[in-house]
Amino acid sequence: MSLHNAQDSDAIAWAKAPTKVIDVNGVPFAYRELGPRGGVPVVFLHHFTAVMDDWDPRVLDGIARHHHVIAFDNRGVGASGSRVPADLTQMGVDAIAFIRALGRDTVDLFGFSLGGAVAQVIALREPWLVRRMVLAGTGPRGGSGIDKMARIVTSAYLKAALTRKDPRHFLFFPRTSEGKRAANDYFARLAERTDGRDKPISIQARFAQIAAIVRGGKATPDDLSVVTHPTFVANGDHDLMVASEHSEDLARRLPNSQLTIYPNSGHGGVFQYHQRFVPEVLEFLAQP
């Protein structure tokens, strides 16, 4: 892994974006960036068990056509150092420290799943740091049933072992012909990066993340009425991991939000519908 000059990434596709490293309070954080310089960057916050290679290239490349995009491995994830904390608030604190280390004082946030929960922490703790948010496949802290995700994940991992498939075939997409086709297309896109791939998620990171999610599900709900940032909430209509009604509840509780629910799709609905989702995000981010 090498450290590259900041200007190297402007015209590079996500599959070719070099991995960089920055020291954040003594911990090396791995990240990649692409897209035009200037303006407010979009910082991507990854999902449960994800490393940078798990972002859909069509989503990042699509948004990077008009915005500078930054994706990173949070503390203890993938190529970043240290250990993953079993606490959503600490994950948010770590993400804030990373953003500050890059010298950014205003960002847009794109949080998917676990990343959406982390984005909410950031907006609550340092609201002046955030301009706009895209929250996909996620719900509010203290949402009923989110703490049951450990059982859902375990079931998917068992099915994956029996079928020799990635668990996300069962967690992200419905087991319909349309959903299976979308899953296969998604994994084909993830395989487009062939060089300089990230380190896989560790066992410690998996257990810490699921512990943080369960703890967050049992927590006292946050007062989201104070989060006044414009927010685009999106999900599929059959999300097994974060029930779609939690995304609807999130949108109701955020006073300046808009909601899109994609039909015949699950937790990965924004990837299944990337051709529709990306233009909607670009339109949302283009607003002042």
Where are these regions (language model features)?
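Active-site loop/oxyanion-hole signature of alpha/beta-hydrolase fold enzymes
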Residues: I70-F110
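Flexible "cap/lid" loop of the alpha/beta hydrolase fold
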Residues: L124, R131-T163
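Short beta-strand/loop motif that positions the catalytic acidic residue
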Residues: V227, V233-N235
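Acidic catalytic loop of the alpha/beta-hydrolase fold
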Residues: H238-V242
